[in-house]
Amino acid sequence: MAGFIQRRKLDLLLAIFSNLQYGSLTVTLPDGSTRVFDGARPGPSADVQFHSMDAVARLISDGKMGFCEAVMDGEIDSSSMSCLIELAVMHDEYLTKQMAANAWRRISLRLFHGLRRNSKFGSARNIAYHYDLGNDFYSSWLDSTMTYSSAVYDRDSDDLSTAQRNKYRNLADLADIQPGDHVLEIGCGWGGFAKYAVEERGARVTGITISKEQHDFARKRLADAGLSDRAEVKLIDYRDLEGRFDKIVSIEMFEAVGQAYWGTYFEAISSLLKDGGRAALQAITIEDDAFDEYVRDPDFIQRYIFPGGMLPSMPRLERPVEDAGLKLMESNGFGLHYARTLAEWRDRFNAAWPGLAKDKFDMRFKRMWELYLSYCEGGFRAGMIDVKQLLFVHNRPTGG
């Protein structure tokens, strides 16, 4: 009976693959045999290897999450995971219908996500889960700017450090940072943008973070550069900060705010921004057509990488922005730049792995991080997600 059920699930999987509409897929089955499926429309060429019948069963029974967990466990592999993810995203609606996770699994994932709400306590816990892996971990594969957000490649020849500084420049231009401006950076990371804004724009910067690891690193970095008199880093939640600032910058911190707190976040920006000020944000967004399913069924990233995370779609931001008395003035998307950034990070992560493996990280962690970077790259290449630089100003007079 068990053998019959396994064969039935394999037949079902192959039937699903036979409806490929885009690109091509080469499938290697547990017995070593290979099947090739070609779509009628252009798309990426990808491959996938199933190392056990259990992997087939997990994909059929648990859908996207089953696939991701099977990859983490070494039961499914691909020579180009980002291409496989891109191909899957291009068939997302069909695959979701054919391989939906079972009801209990979906409920458990929703409960986990719900328990990771970004209250002040929850935010600190969620941020620590990801960023307190250790500064040594991140410094081993990030570039010299220690920047963990999408770069901007002005030229094909730009290396990662140059492209990260391009991003800093674009955000500083968008915010119109001038010499003497007091700039607030919400989610200052390891201090890369703060250092740039002081050295290159003559600004005074207050950076805030709720990661103790990042706080300590950024303070030392700015002190070592002789910038402590013009740049300060505070370990504080954005909801507890007081004061008024000429300009505000926030780089890919919004994804950690959580939908329940979007209004609170924009209200904080509105109250912290001086009259006539400008707030420049860099944020990852998701297509609005995919948003409801994304909210309903938390994904691999929310479960294993960024607990409590939530990508916005642009239409869903309109109400909280308006209610906070703000107005969106510019929106510039550059998703393919993020795809390239992620590919470079993955190469650098793999190059650094021998040293990381000697520390506290095992092969399951390695496969999880490779999947995370490939998962995001594929999403950007397929256009399901984007990264945007956004400019906000007050839409009404504010007191002060």
Regions found by a protein language model. Give the residues of each.
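Feature captures hydrophobic
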Residues: 1-164, 170
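A short glycine-rich, Lys/Arg-flanked "PGG" loop and its adjoining helix->strand segment in the class I
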Residues: 263-276
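Conserved beta-strand signature within the Rossmann-like core of class I S-adenosyl-L-methionine
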Residues: 276-284
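Substrate-binding/catalytic lobe of Class I Rossmann-like enzymes that use SAM or dcSAM, i.e.
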Residues: 284-389, 393-400
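A short acidic, Gly/Pro-enriched loop at the edge of an enzyme's catalytic core
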Residues: 239-248
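Conserved SAM-binding loop of SAM-dependent methyltransferases across substrates and taxa
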Residues: 190-201
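Conserved class I S-adenosyl-L-methionine
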Residues: 179-187
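Conserved SAM-binding loop
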Residues: 218-219
